[in-house]
């Protein structure tokens, strides 16, 4: 099992549930190091003073907040540590709300909460209660040196998930956007758009959306490591420009129908094979019984 990154307690009223926190997401981004193209040596980043033009030791570096162009207010580590929240080692639940009330823009990182064996019943009780009520919990927790706003919610397999959240004043309102004025869609355009949405609707299956760029980059790295010659791929031709919104919707609907037919064809074939197999297994006994009746 992965290593816990935090341990403490999940508090629910007067109920105290000892838990450990595990990362729920592991990014698989392809990471590169910076190298000198002449000799392949690693590039080092150093703390360099722009005035004295020399490297500065870490102990002589302070944090500065720019209050006006070129003017900074410096703050020491000790001054900042005085404002660090007290590490209470608790995820304290304050409220229960509908998940649909929370804009996805609020969510940051995701984790799993795992209880101690002694608290398994209380952990399940909280999860079952939230599932039955259709609610999620809003909580606060001190993770590292920051007090985080959190959402605790039921997850698959009876687990509880915790997502850290942005604060309200960190979310930009869509009202601040300068959206261009749009004309009223025609009833035909709206009908075709609704048909397109319906034709592309289905269950969320995240495995259908792999990171193709990452796969291609890893393949490129593997081929270069094996000494294979690499040719730059030819640019894909641009698609024909569609001028009319109605034409674009119509073409999209046609493409969606073709895709649906391609997916349906194997399914129809599988159903035909299954029906034929069933007929073979069930038809023979019937035929045998019929022939026996005739002989009798």
From Swiss-Prot:
Keywords (A to Z) from UniProt: DNA damage, DNA recombination, DNA repair, DNA-binding
InterPro entries: Ku70/Ku80_beta-barrel_dom, Prok_Ku, SPOC-like_C_dom_sf
Residue ranges, compositional bias (Basic residues): 286-296
A biological-process GO annotation: double-strand break repair via nonhomologous end joining
Region (Disordered): 254-296
Biased composition (Low complexity): 275-285
Listed Basic and acidic residues bias regions: 258-273
Its job: With LigD forms a non-homologous end joining (NHEJ) DNA repair enzyme, which repairs dsDNA breaks with reduced fidelity. Binds linear dsDNA with 5'- and 3'- overhangs but not closed circular dsDNA nor ssDNA. Recruits and stimulates the ligase activity of LigD.
UniProt-listed PANTHER family: NON-HOMOLOGOUS END JOINING PROTEIN KU
Family: Belongs to the prokaryotic Ku family.
Subunit note: Homodimer. Interacts with LigD.
Name the UniProt record assigns to this protein: Non-homologous end joining protein Ku
Protein source organism: Anaeromyxobacter sp. (strain K)
């Amino acid at each position: 099992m992965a290593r816990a990154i935090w341990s403490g307690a999940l508090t629910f009223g007067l109920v105290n549930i000892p838990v450990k926190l595990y990362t729920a997401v592991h990014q698989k981004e392809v990471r590169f190091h910076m190298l000198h193209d002449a000799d392949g040596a690693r590039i080092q980043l150093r703390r360099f003073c722009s005035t004295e033009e020399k490297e500065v030791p870490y102990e002589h570096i302070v944090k500065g907040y720019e209050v006006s162009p070129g003017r900074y207010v410096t703050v020491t580590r000790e001054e900042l540590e005085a404002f660090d929240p007290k590490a209470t080692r608790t995820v304290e639940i304050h409220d229960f709300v509908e998940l649909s009330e929370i804009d996805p823009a609020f969510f940051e990182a995701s984790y799993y909460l795992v209880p101690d064996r002694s608290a398994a019943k209380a952990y399940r009780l909280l999860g079952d209660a939230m599932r039955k009520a259709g609610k999620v919990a809003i909580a606060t927790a001190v993770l590292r040196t920051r007090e985080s706003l959190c959402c605790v919610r039921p997850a698959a397999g009876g687990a509880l998930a915790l997502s850290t959240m942005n604060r309200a004043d960190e979310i930009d309102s869509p009202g601040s956007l300068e959206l261009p004025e749009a004309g009223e869609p025609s009833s035909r355009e709206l009908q075709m758009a609704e048909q397109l949405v319906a034709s592309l609707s289905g269950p969320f299956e995240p495995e259908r959306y792999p990171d193709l760029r990452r796969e291609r980059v890893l393949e490129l790295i593997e081929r270069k490591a094996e000494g294979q010659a690499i040719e730059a791929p030819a640019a894909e031709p641009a698609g024909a420009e569609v001028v009319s919104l109605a034409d674009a919707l119509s073409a999209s609907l046609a493409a969606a129908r073709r895709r649906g037919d391609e997916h349906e064809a194997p399914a129809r074939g599988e159903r035909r094979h299954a029906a034929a197999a069933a007929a073979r297994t069930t038809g023979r006994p019937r035929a045998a019984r019929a022939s026996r009746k005739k002989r009798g």
